[in-house]
């Protein structure tokens, strides 16, 4: 059993000069900056995010990162000419080039950033699953790539509440582009999915939680795009046992509760900190029922704790074909762990939630640099795995909370010298 310990993952002290590994990683991205000084500002910003100091705003980073100042860091996020979307696309293609198992899935989820005041772009009193309540916050919709042994962020988009989208004065003050209009979180997720198609990101399926899985328009959007998916749904998800109208719609939990215990089988999906993660599962071929009565063939999957385990039942829906092994769908849906882990780590370790500006572009540039910084850590871990092949089953995807950044960078230094 592999025991994991929560550790600090940040650099204990900012070096006076560039880290050789970071310089190598960032070299391909310098093409997005017209001047060397501009690219150097990006390197200093990333270095600041990797530092152990808990505050990651421009003022604080300028005070602890040599070779820069608050004005340069702020200029990088606001007025400097560079295309953050194009840089992010290049980063995604770079990460896809890493030798890996190639069995990735696309994860979508949203996360909240608690805020004071009313001027930060998109901030409003709104519900966020991060806080489990209505509170003053910003919310982003995010896309993540996850294989069994490699996981990293793809894209993020700020959710713009209707009160912001329809307020011309606030839009102008926050520099919100004209093309950005009100969209639901599910609609934003579908747009991010379309972007992954344009980049040609190979993937086996889409995985989301019940906030998206219980959204018929989202599922219909996936099917219209010919996407396979395994999604979490709520207990009252509407299904029917047959296609004809004589088969009435029923709640998912009622149907699964009627199944005999002997029909449920134990499946384990990965190793956790306390051993194998496993539970009892049952799958039923049936139809989901839209609000207008339209029926779509797929799998209703139930999960309940095994003997001696605590926890509540969970429900999933998938449009995988009839011959798909249940073990495959179970393993896919539980990869959602990696986007939740990223949300926690990008905030706690890299300062994703600490952008203090008020503008749309600055918010997204900061997020792009956070994703770049996270990808740097994943890349370092990937390099070490290439030189330190281990026997036995593949290791889980890298997570910064499993190994300190200082150790990762120190070990990588021997590779780069």
What function would you assign to each model-found segment?
Residues 2-207, 211-230, 234-238, 244-246, ...:
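Conserved, well-structured functional cores that handle cations and Mg-NTP chemistry
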Residues 188, 211-217, 292, 323-325, ...:
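Short, well-ordered secondary-structure "scaffold" segments embedded in the functional core
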Residues 287-324:
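Charge-patterned, long linear interaction tracts outside catalytic cores
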Residues 1-37, 49, 160, 167-169, ...:
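A short, flexible helix-boundary coil/loop motif
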Residues 142, 318, 331, 370-373:
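Conserved, well-structured core segments
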Residues 49, 53, 65, 80, ...:
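Generic structural signal for hydrophobic core residues of well-folded globular domains
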Residues 108, 112, 212, 257, ...:
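Short amphipathic alpha-helical "interface-anchor" segments enriched in bulky aromatics
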Residues 139, 312, 338, 368-371:
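Catalytic-loop motifs flanking and including active-site residues across diverse enzymes
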């Amino acid at each position: 059993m592999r025991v994991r310990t929560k550790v600090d993952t940040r650099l204990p002290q900012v070096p006076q000069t560039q880290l050789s590994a970071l310089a190598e990683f960032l070299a391909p991205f310098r093409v997005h900056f017209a001047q060397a000084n501009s690219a150097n500002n990006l390197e200093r910003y990333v270095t600041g995010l990797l530092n152990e100091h808990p505050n990651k705003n421009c003022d604080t980073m300028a005070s602890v990162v040599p070779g820069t100042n608050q004005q340069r860091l702020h200029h990088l996020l606001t007025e400097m000419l560079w295309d953050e979307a194009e840089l992010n696309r290049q980063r995604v293609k770079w990460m896809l080039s890493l030798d890996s198992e190639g069995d990735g899935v696309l994860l979508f989820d949203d996360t909240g950033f608690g805020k004071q005041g009313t001027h930060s772009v998109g901030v409003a009193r709104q519900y966020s699953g991060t806080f489990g309540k209505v509170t003053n916050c910003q919310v982003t919709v995010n896309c993540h790539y996850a294989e069994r042994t490699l996981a990293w962020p793809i894209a993020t988009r700020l959710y713009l509440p209707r009160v912001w989208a329809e307020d011309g004065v606030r839009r102008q003050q926050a520099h919100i582009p004209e093309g950005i209009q009100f969209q639901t979180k599910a609609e934003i997720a579908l747009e991010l999915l379309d972007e992954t198609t344009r980049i040609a990101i190979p993937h086996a399926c889409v995985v989301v939680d019940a906030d998206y899985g219980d959204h018929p328009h989202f599922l219909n959007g996936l099917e219209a795009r010919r996407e396979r998916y395994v999604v979490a749904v709520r207990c009252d998800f509407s299904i029917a046992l047959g296609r004809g109208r004589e088969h009435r719609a029923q709640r998912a939990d009622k149907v699964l509760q009627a199944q005999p215990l002997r029909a449920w089988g134990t499946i384990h999906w990965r190793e956790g900190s306390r051993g194998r993660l496993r539970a009892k599962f049952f799958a039923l071929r049936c139809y989901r029922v839209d609000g207008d009565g339209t029926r779509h063939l797929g799998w209703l999957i139930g999960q309940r704790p095994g003997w001696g385990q605590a926890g509540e039942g969970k429900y999933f829906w998938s449009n995988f074909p009839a011959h798909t092994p249940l073990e495959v769908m179970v393993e896919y849906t539980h990869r959602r762990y990696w986007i939740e882990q990223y949300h926690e780590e990008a905030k706690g370790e890299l300062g994703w939630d600490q952008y203090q500006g008020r503008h749309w572009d600055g918010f997204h540039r900061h997020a792009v640099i956070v994703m770049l910084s996270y990808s740097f850590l994943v890349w370092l871990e990937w390099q070490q795995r290439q030189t330190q092949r281990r026997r036995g089953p593949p290791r889980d995807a890298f997570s910064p909370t499993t190994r300190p950044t200082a150790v990762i960078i120190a070990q990588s230094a021997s590779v780069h010298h």
